[in-house]
């Protein structure tokens, strides 16, 4: 990172599932604690895979988090002594998240968000592309393709071991039993078989 002499900026950590997004968010939050900075972490209520009140990485690292239902609920927890605001699984938040993040950065907070940049179909996911556009720093992580071992930038949704159809629901919170990382060439999204 570059030396920043002003307070308030946005960092986006994005990539496919199993690329280390939550792990990187946790690492950055822990570094702020060593620097005696005050941080708060948020997560959407919908993300309760491993814990209701922690952000937990797939490898078991965790940090306490405040679950919120709507983006603007974040404001209720912001205090002046905070330096850093971190938000995990940002793709699951409503459309107001972009404004919330902008307001917080403009008020002088370092805002770190992490989330999927593409849905299981390989299309831009939620508000993440907008957040990437307004961020000062974007870190795009890759996993390893579970089929061929190449760098994986996509998330494959599997239903009973088979790729999910294009028009299946976008949001379905799961872990390794329903998703795996894939490269561009091994990623498959068939048309709906019912049509």
Swiss-Prot record:
Question: What is stated as this protein's family in its record?
Answer: Belongs to the thymidine kinase family.
The principal localisation class reads: cytoplasm
Give the active-site positions. 89 (proton acceptor)
The name on file for this protein is: Thymidine kinase
From the UniProt record, give one GO term of the biological process aspect: thymidine metabolic process
Q: How does it assemble?
A: Homotetramer.
Q: What is the lineage of its organism?
A: Bacteria, Bacillati, Bacillota, Bacilli, Bacillales
Q: Main EC class of this protein? A: transferase
NCBIfam families named in the record: PRK04296.1-1 (NF003296)
Which Pfam families does the UniProt entry name for this protein? TK (PF00265)
Q: Which domain of life is it from?
A: Bacteria
Disulfide bond annotation, renumbered to this chain: none
The record ties this protein, via PROSITE patterns, to:
TK_CELLULAR_TYPE
A cellular component annotation (GO) from this entry: cytosol
The record lists the organism as Bacillus cereus (strain ATCC 14579 / DSM 31 / CCUG 7414 / JCM 2152 / NBRC 15305 / NCIMB 9373 / NCTC 2599 / NRRL B-3711)
């Amino acid at each position: 990172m570059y030396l920043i002499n002003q307070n308030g900026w946005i960092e986006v950590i994005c990539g496919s599932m199993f690329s280390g997004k939550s792990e990187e968010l946790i690492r950055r939050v822990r570094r702020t604690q060593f620097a005696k900075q005050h941080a708060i972490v948020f997560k959407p209520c919908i993300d309760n895979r491993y814990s209701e009140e922690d952000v937990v990485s797939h490898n078991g690292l965790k940090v306490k988090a405040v679950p919120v239902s709507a983006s603007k609920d974040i404001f209720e927890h912001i205090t002046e002594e905070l330096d850093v605001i971190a938000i995990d699984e940002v793709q699951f938040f409503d459309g107001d998240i972009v404004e919330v993040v902008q307001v917080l950065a403009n008020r002088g907070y370092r805002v770190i968000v992490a989330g999927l940049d593409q849905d299981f179909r390989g299309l831009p996911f939620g508000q993440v592309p907008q957040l990437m556009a307004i961020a000062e720093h974007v870190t795009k992580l890759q996993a390893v393709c579970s089929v061929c071992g190449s760098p994986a930038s996509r998330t494959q949704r599997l239903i009973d071991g088979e790729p999910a159809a294009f028009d299946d629901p976008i949001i379905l919170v799961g872990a390794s039993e329903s998703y795996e990382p894939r490269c561009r060439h091994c990623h498959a999204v068939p048309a709906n078989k019912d049509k």
